[in-house]
Amino acid sequence: MKLTDYVKQVSLEDFCRPFIHHVQWNRRLRSTGGRFFPKDGHLDFNPKVYQELGLDVFRKIVRHELCHYHLYFQGKGYQHKDRDFKELLKAVDGLRFVPSLPNSNSKPIKLYRCQSCQQTYQRKRRIDTRRYRCGLCRGKLLLINQPED
């Protein structure tokens, strides 16, 4: 089933209102499941949410974006802070936030410990231990765990 057909179906089933604008996938979305554009009424969806979290979660995200869509065109409060939006989202069982996706781009955490005071530091980037020292006692830093790259 095409994305546009699916969104139209969800709109009719859950909102009893037609969806008449454009829908597209947007791979560049990272922290959100979808986006509504009031200027022209189209919706963007994150394909990773559908691929990794499944159709059930994706349907709830479609409902969320359709809440923005239908409330905007009814002239009601369509933003997250508005009561109309919160009530409609609850009524159609949409998601308020997207569950976190398994992030393949995350860097492993490197753990450093001061040899003098035992203070630990967690960093995503490597620290040059010959150049940098402990911020508390100026002691020498030692890399404790070497993550697999």
Swiss-Prot record:
Cofactor note: Binds 1 zinc ion.
Positions annotated to bind Zn(2+): 64, 68
UniProt family annotation: Belongs to the SprT family.
Annotated keywords: Cytoplasm, Metal-binding, Zinc
A single GO cellular-component term on record: cytoplasm
HAMAP family the UniProt entry points to: SprT_like (MF_00745)
Required cofactor(s): Zn(2+)
One Pfam short name: SprT-like
GO molecular function, one term: zinc ion binding
Native source species: Streptococcus pneumoniae (strain 70585)
Name under which the protein is recorded: Protein SprT-like
Keyword Cytoplasm: yes
Any single biological process term in GO: response to stress
Location in the cell: Cytoplasm
Active site, renumbered: 65
Parts forming coiled coils: none
SMART domains attached to this UniProt entry: SprT (SM00731)
Domain SprT-like: 6-143
